[in-house]
Amino acid sequence: MNYYNVGKIIATHGLKGEVKVALTTDFPEDRFRAGSRLYLGDDSREVTVAAGRPFKQFWLVTFAEITDIDQAEKLKGTEILISEEDQGELPDGVYYYRELLGCKVLDDESGEEIGELTDIEAPGANDIWEVTDKNGKSFWLPYIPQVVKSVDIDKKEVRVELMEGLR
C-alpha cells in the first residue's frame, strides 16, 4: 500500500495529548476530521483522529490513541501519512502535487517542450509552479487559467501559454 504525507507533528499542545501539525496537505478539513484514519511515521502505526482544528498556520490534532502529553511528546518530528485508498477522488481540474511533479511543460501553441515541472508552492491565492528547462534554468508560472491551458496526467503533460515576462 502507498502512503502520502499530509503533515508533520512539530510540538505538543496542552496536557491531554493534542499535537501541533505543520501541514503538507491542501485538505486539512478532510484529513483531520474526527474519525479519519491516518498513519504515523515510518512504521505506519494506524491512528484515528478524535478532533482537529485550525490554529494560526497550523492544525491542532488529537488522536484517540494518544491521551497525554508524555505520549504526544514522543511524536515530535513524526510524519503523518494517509493511505492511497483513504485519499478519495478529487474534482475535475484539481490534482495531487505528486501527479503534477515531473510533467513535461509544453507551449500550447507550438507544442515545443519548455521544460519540466519541478516544484509547486502555495504562497497565496494561487499555486505557483517551478519549471526547469533543459539547461537547468528555472522560472515560476502562476497556476491560473490564462497561463495553464490544459493538464493531462496520463501523458504527464501540461500545456501553457507564456505571458510576457514569465520566462
From Swiss-Prot:
Gene3D superfamilies the record matches: PRC-barrel domain (2.30.30.240), RimM (2.40.30.60)
Name its cellular compartments.
Answer: Cytoplasm
Q: Which GO terms describe its molecular function?
A: ribosome binding
| Highest taxon of the lineage | Bacteria
Cited Pfam families: PRC_RimM, RimM
Which biological processes are named by the entry's GO terms?
A: ribosomal small subunit biogenesis; rRNA processing
Would the keyword Ion transport be found if you checked this record's keyword annotation? no
* UniProt keyword terms in alphabetical order: Chaperone, Cytoplasm, Ribosome biogenesis, rRNA processing
Q: Which positions fall inside the PRC barrel domain?
A: 92-166
Q: What is its main location?
A: cytoplasm
Which InterPro entries would you find in this protein's record? PRC_barrel-like_sf, PRC_RimM, RimM, RimM_N, RimM_N_sf, Transl_B-barrel_sf
Q: Which family does it belong to?
A: Belongs to the RimM family.
What job does this protein perform? An accessory protein needed during the final step in the assembly of 30S ribosomal subunit, possibly for assembly of the head region. Essential for efficient processing of 16S rRNA. May be needed both before and after RbfA during the maturation of 16S rRNA. It has affinity for free ribosomal 30S subunits but not for 70S ribosomes.
Under the subunit heading, UniProt states: Binds ribosomal protein uS19.
Q: Which NCBIfam families does this chain map to?
A: 16S_RimM (TIGR02273)
What does the record's free text say on domains?
The PRC barrel domain binds ribosomal protein uS19.
Q: What is this protein called?
A: Ribosome maturation factor RimM
